[in-house]
Amino acid sequence: MEFMVSASFRPQNQAEILARVPQEQARIKALREQGTVEALYISSDRSHVWVVMQGESQDQVQKELESLPLYPYMEVAITPLSGI
């Protein structure tokens, strides 16, 4: 099942966020290789991301998101998608 994840970053944590970016990139790469992350889009000001993810359930997608180093700094919404 496909899900759209919309995540905003809390601006007060910029220094902490920047320090974790390399670990975040490595984890996203691993999730792409597993087929869990299909696409990732970042806003031009880097305050928001949209991720298309595959998962058996919304709970599974939530658990994968919680594995991201930047997850503690995110406000996340997960929306199930349906094909046209």
Where are these regions (language model features)?
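Conserved, structured core segments of small domains
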Residues: 1-84
